């Protein structure tokens, strides 16, 4: 009985000292936009489009493509909800502007089948938001 207890204490001590190192190797950290920053980005895009005479919807997704913010101008059509969300998702997912993706996925090009993936928006209006070499989010208009 005493030996079993000593063995249990030794095993617990071993796990306690090796767990932080093992955990550090088994996890990773990511960076992303706060919802406040995502909202500011969406507001800036909406204002720029208004100044250019466009009524739009603007979506900002996190780096995984999950929508954080959506703004729709008063006269923006109902299609703008899905269009903006899919452009933000595409830009974040592929880490490329949707205009560039549209060019790279034209019929006959090696990556043309990407257009068959649900939610891919291969048309202009989506950009990845990047900082320090990392994609933080996607924005779509």
What is each stretch, according to the model?
Residues 1-10:
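Bacterial N-terminal signal peptides that target proteins for export
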